[in-house]
């Protein structure tokens, strides 16, 4: 299921500052995280859907790379994103 336009703009504004700032790593991670949670719910209902599982693994990999970049560039922004999205315990 794709994100609604309003919800996507809300995430972009929250993590990027403006609704046009979609390139920030924080925005990318937040959007990936939302899509990952949607796909996780889908896969719990449809465990044999291998194509969606591959898509989920690709999204997790993209999020991991974006978080690694953010950690190397700005550790304070990385910690803030982790806290806001509850990604690490």
Curated annotation (Swiss-Prot):
Q: Cross-referenced InterPro entries, in alphabetical order?
A: Ribosomal_uS15 (IPR000589), Ribosomal_uS15_bac-type (IPR005290), uS15_NS1_RNA-bd_sf (IPR009068)
Q: Which GO terms describe its cellular component?
A: cytosolic small ribosomal subunit
Q: Its GO biological process terms?
A: translation
- The protein's superkingdom reads Bacteria
One GO MF term on file is:
rRNA binding
Give each disulfide bond as a residue pair: none
Keywords in alphabetical order:
Ribonucleoprotein, Ribosomal protein, RNA-binding, rRNA-binding
Q: Does the keyword RNA-binding apply?
A: yes
Give the matching Pfam families. Answer: Ribosomal_S15
**Key word Cell membrane present in the record?**
no
> What is the stated purpose of this protein?
One of the primary rRNA binding proteins, it binds directly to 16S rRNA where it helps nucleate assembly of the platform of the 30S subunit by binding and bridging several RNA helices of the 16S rRNA. Forms an intersubunit bridge (bridge B4) with the 23S rRNA of the 50S subunit in the ribosome.
Task: Say which family it is in.
Answer: Belongs to the universal ribosomal protein uS15 family.
Q: Which PANTHER family does the entry mention?
A: RIBOSOMAL PROTEIN S15, BACTERIAL AND ORGANELLAR (PTHR23321), SMALL RIBOSOMAL SUBUNIT PROTEIN US15M (PTHR23321:SF26)
Known partners and oligomeric status? Part of the 30S ribosomal subunit. Forms a bridge to the 50S subunit in the 70S ribosome, contacting the 23S rRNA.
Q: What is this protein called?
A: Small ribosomal subunit protein uS15
The top of its lineage is: Bacteria, Pseudomonadati, Chlorobiota, Chlorobiia, Chlorobiales
